[in-house]
């Protein structure tokens, strides 16, 4: 049983439409992921560089941000790198019992 030429072109047109619809779905899925905040590692590195470029108080080496994103375990690092990651005393020097410290609304509200 042979198909005529008209039926063959119809099948090819349907196949082309299906392929185009699949490409469109893939494209919109990628765009939706970006809008929801799901980024590839390279997109994440680019956005990190763009954000940190405008912070005058934070000197960033670009190699740190473009590298692979991984969690750092301080216990596994050498002593010199572990001490660099720890906060200084003035960064976290506060009274744990003073819950409303620095909250202007709570200080004058009652």
Curated annotation (Swiss-Prot):
It is found in: Host nucleus. Residues 23-37 have a biased composition (Basic residues). GO terms for cellular component: host cell nucleus. Residues 16-45 are annotated as: Disordered. Keywords: Host nucleus, Host-virus interaction, Inhibition of host innate immune response by virus, Suppressor of RNA silencing, Viral immunoevasion. GO terms for biological process: symbiont-mediated suppression of host innate immune response. It comes from the Viruses. A motif (Nuclear localization signal) lies at residues 22-27. Its main location: host cell. Belongs to the cucumovirus/ilarvirus protein 2b family. Homotetramer. Interacts with host AGO1; this interaction blocks AGO1 cleavage activity to attenuate RNA silencing and thus counter host defense. Interacts with host JAZ. Multifunctional protein that plays two independent roles: viral suppressor of host RNAi (VSR) and viral inducer of host attractiveness to insect vectors (VIA). Acts as a suppressor of RNA-mediated gene silencing, also known as post-transcriptional gene silencing (PTGS), a mechanism of plant viral defense that limits the accumulation of viral RNAs. May directly interfere with mobile silencing signaling. Also inhibits signal transduction by the phytohormone jasmonate, making the infected plant more attractive to aphids, which are the second host to play a role as a dissemination vector. This is Suppressor of silencing 2b. The lineage of its organism: Viruses, Riboviria, Orthornavirae, Kitrinoviricota, Alsuviricetes.
